[in-house]
Amino acid sequence: MSEAAPRVGPRPEFGPSLPAWLRARFGVPPLVTLGVVAVVALVAAVAIVITLSSPSAPGKQVVHPSPPVFNLLYPPALMHRVAARPGELMRIEGHRGKLTTEIVVRPLKLPAYKGDVTHGLLPVYADRFADAQAKLLPGFLLTSEGRARVNNGVGYELVFQSVRPARRVYGRDVLLVPDDITEGKGLVILSLRQTKPGGPFTKAEQPLAYQSKKAYRSFRFGTSRG
């Protein structure tokens, strides 16, 4: 007895194929249907490749070319570079609603130290830095601290807040040392401040709050984006 040939095509319980259904219902030739499906599949595949390979909008790059050398990206629709104040290397600000954000870079000068700076000296220096911030911000509360990496820099980060009925301040300060001292040519203090009078961020303020954190995290030593 010969074996039955295997069934080719859709099983009966699944109904007719798409080309057969379109031909029976609307008179569309099967070759036309298959051609349209192939084009749609190709467009979808290209869209997936673009999504996976294209980076998100990077923002505007700003470079500090003299030591310490660094650059970062910021969203020009929400933030803008302003003149640095005394003791600062760079200042970027944004305003939306009642929210004000600031990203500030300052030079970091440490005493001579023979050991591992990031493990030995920075935590001690960070404690003193936190004490200084506590004197400036009433209601200062240190919410977290520890070693941190920001792209090609490693250091120690302090995260804190000062919440009062009339004013809220959320801050981050990271003391950064470049992986390659010849690239960064110096150490920095990278700071983020988000300040508004009372209440949590509104829906209109949330994009600035989010994008300012991304800009803070975009910091890199050197002039390239890696």
Locations of regions flagged by a protein language model:
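N-terminal intrinsically disordered, acidic low-complexity segments at the extreme N-terminus
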Residues: 1-22
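Ser/Thr/Pro/Gly-rich low-complexity linker/stalk segments immediately outside membranes or between
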Residues: 21-26, 50-71
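Hydrophobic membrane-insertion alpha-helices, especially the h-region
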Residues: 25-53
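Short, well-structured beta-strand
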Residues: 35, 146-226
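Short, hydrophobic/aromatic-rich segments at coil-to-beta transitions
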Residues: 57-62, 86-91, 151-161
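Secretory pathway targeting signatures of secreted, lumenal, and periplasmic proteins
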Residues: 69-127, 161, 167-169
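Short, solvent-exposed helix-to-loop capping segments enriched in aromatics
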Residues: 124-136
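A short, amphipathic edge element
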Residues: 135-143
